[in-house]
Amino acid sequence: MSDRSARSATKIMLCLAFVLSTAPRLICQGGNTASLTCWEGKDRSNFQSRKAKSPTAKASGGFAYAEAVAEASKDMGDAQFCKNKVQLFYSKDGNDYKVVYEKSGLEDQGVGIRVLGWSHTGTQLLLEVAVWGYDRDMDLVKSALALDSVTGEVKELPLSDAFERVLGKDCEYDSSVVGWGNDDSVLIRVGKTPPTTRYNQTFCVDKPTVYAFNMRSRSLARSSP
């Protein structure tokens, strides 16, 4: 190798070393796929990219787990930004997992995912996906989804339409997926939303109430205690 070639190779290696040393590290932490962020600590001083993986949910319908990534970045003014992405991995036999669901947040938008377990029949996996804004001007939006082990497809449950039929159109409420009922209905807890001064709120839920969503009829009914 000539001296010129050797110098060029050395420059390339030094450049690669610099890039690798300055690239943000991806810190893996526990199973917090529901609310993973780029910040940690009381003063939010620990700012970096992070990754989380849920435990594997197992049933006769297959195996599934979720991953969440919070990607940290800064602009020229050193302002901090965080963007999330979540994925659901599924396998029939525990081998060769494939991504069957993926959702990426917009700039400075968080996305989380909860794996709530398989139905009693082992054919459907219940999930909850949440989207929020890191600038705090965006409301937290939650969606319930189900993975069908027969088709391998993930579909959103039409809970908004079902609650509109029960509670009415102009109704504000906070909802959270509880899990599966004994009859493989999906249990949803609704309650009052946090107060805000950004708009006039219309409440129709006085106290936390659990509803059962029938997967076949797409209807809601109050769940027995």
Where are each of the predicted segments found?
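Bacterial N-terminal signal peptides
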Residues: 13-21
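Acidic, small-residue rich beta-repeat scaffolds with periodic aromatic anchors
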Residues: 21-55, 144-225
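Terminal domain-start segments
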Residues: 28-108, 209, 214-217
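Blade-terminus and WD-like Trp-Asp/Gly-His loop motifs, strongest in beta-propeller folds
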Residues: 51-63, 69, 116-124, 177-186
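Extracellular-facing segments of soluble proteins and assemblies that are Gly/Ser/Thr-biased and enriched
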Residues: 105-147
